[in-house]
Amino acid sequence: GKAKYALAAEPSLSMIMTKKPGTKVVVDIQEEWKKAFAGASYPQASLIVNAEFLKKHPEYVKAFLANVKESSEWVKENPQKAAEYASQIAALPPPPILSKAIPKLNIAFVEAEKARPAVEAYLKVLAETDPKFIGGSLPDDAFYYKAK
């Protein structure tokens, strides 16, 4: 409670702002990233699938991705219900706080091929610090799932 400055992600930021109403957001990292990278969002989460599993179960992967897409859309359209459910199954802030945070979470389902430019921009930033952070080089085409 005594920090002058902090870098906080959602839903922690909404929790802080609820407990300390005078708290101000000075810099929005998502907005700064968009300014630096021509409006592109940065990737926050990825689904990684073992190549052998994908070969054996392509329909399962396709159906799973469709469900992830549908779920992400539902969460954005129903933040209160999503917050209530999520608070029951995970150690998260209470629903009133979590429901305020959901619209700020930048939840979006983006297919791998379409996400590739944003993923590569993000990985290049990491590689500038140390190429070892990304395994020495950018992933090749096989890294990005293509629905068939």
Placement of each model-derived feature along the sequence:
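Short secondary-structure capping/turn micro-motifs that flank functional sites
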Residues: 14-15, 92, 142-143
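A local structural motif
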Residues: 2-4, 22, 96, 113, ...
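Poly-acidic low-complexity segments
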Residues: 27-29, 78, 111, 115, ...
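Generic structural "secondary-structure junction" signal
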Residues: 49, 55-56, 104-111, 136, ...
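Pocket-lining segment of extracytoplasmic ligand-binding domains
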Residues: 2-85
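Secondary-structure end/capping motifs
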Residues: 54-129
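A generic structural signal for short, solvent-exposed coil/turn residues
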Residues: 17-18, 39, 99, 135-137
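Conserved C-terminal helix/tail region of periplasmic/extracytoplasmic solute-binding proteins
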Residues: 120-148
